[in-house]
């Protein structure tokens, strides 16, 4: 492929150079043939024989240069045409030899092999430059079966409030059901202890906060005794002294 592209480039260069030389030669010939364009045919004031001789020599030189340019351009064009024809023949011969060496039955097999190789290369490139998505990174929007098959540790479940606070809702309900089913049987000590342990923390806190009030009421000596008076830490301000000092502070008239 590289050799073919280089040959095509050389052909294009030859044709361009040949056309340029041909056009330049034609322009020079027309410059000398058409009257009025050449400087030798312009009228001169002196009209001496020297100017006529010089004009004839210049005209002959320009004609010779034009003929050379036209001939070189035509030769380059013919050379480029011949080279292009030769390259086309070589290309056809190579294709014929390839068809003869590789029969038609081997063509589909070779195409399958090429397609398999291309698929493998594409897979390798995709695996090399693979970028995971946000869901894959965060392990979300996956089916449970797929997650368990890949890695059972990936399934994340948040703990409940009861498990964090040490409470369990199933045990109190089960104890209540047992009590309702058998009202004649006395409750077991272990079940009662378990029920005490499984009381909510809020209830415990409220009870503990009200215990000191209960003790205070129980420890009162008698109802006739007045309650203890609570005196403020700082004494109240003396308003009389402030009123007496107020007129003294006024400025004199």
Swiss-Prot record:
Topology in membrane: Multi-pass membrane protein
Compositionally biased residues, Acidic residues: 113-124
Chain ranges passing through the membrane: 17-37, 65-85
Residue ranges, compositional bias (Polar residues): 164-176
Residue pairs linked by disulfide bridges in the UniProt entry: none
Subcellular locations according to the entry: Membrane
Region (Disordered): 93-133, 164-253
Comp. bias intervals (Basic and acidic residues): 206-217, 242-253
GO cellular component term, pick one: membrane
Compositional bias (Pro residues): 224-238
Residue stretches of biased makeup (Basic residues): 194-205
InterPro entries: TMEM51
Keywords for the protein's UniProt record, in alphabetical order: Membrane, Phosphoprotein, Transmembrane, Transmembrane helix
Residues annotated with Phosphoserine modification: 115, 182, 192
UniProt-recorded name of the protein: Transmembrane protein 51
Organism field: Homo sapiens
Gene transcribed to yield this protein: TMEM51
């Amino acid at each position: 492929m590289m050799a073919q592209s280089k040959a095509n480039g050389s052909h294009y260069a030859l044709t361009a150079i040949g056309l340029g030389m041909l056009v330049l030669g034609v322009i020079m010939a027309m410059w000398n043939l058409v009257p009025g364009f050449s400087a030798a045919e312009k009228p001169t004031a002196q009209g001496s024989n020297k100017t006529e001789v010089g004009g004839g020599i210049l005209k002959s030189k320009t004609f010779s240069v034009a003929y050379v340019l036209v001939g070189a351009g035509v030769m380059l064009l013919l050379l480029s045409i011949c080279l292009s024809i030769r390259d086309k023949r070589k290309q056809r011969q190579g294709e014929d030899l390839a068809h003869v060496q590789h029969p038609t039955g081997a063509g589909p097999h070779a195409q399958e092999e090429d397609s398999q190789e291309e698929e493998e290369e594409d897979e390798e490139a995709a695996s090399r430059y693979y970028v995971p998505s946000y869901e894959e990174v965060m392990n979300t929007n996956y089916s449970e079966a797929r997650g368990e098959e890949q890695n059972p540790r990936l399934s994340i479940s948040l703990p409940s409030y009861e498990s964090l606070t040490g409470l369990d809702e199933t045990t109190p309900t089960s104890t209540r059901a047992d009590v309702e089913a058998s009202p004649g049987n006395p409750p077991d000590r272990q079940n009662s202890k378990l029920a005490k342990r499984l009381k909510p923390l809020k209830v415990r806190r409220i009870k503990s906060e009200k215990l000191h009030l209960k003790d205070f009421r129980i420890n009162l000596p008698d109802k006739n005794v007045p309650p203890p008076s609570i005196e403020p830490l700082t004494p109240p301000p003396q308003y009389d002294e402030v009123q007496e000092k107020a007129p003294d502070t006024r400025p004199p008239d």
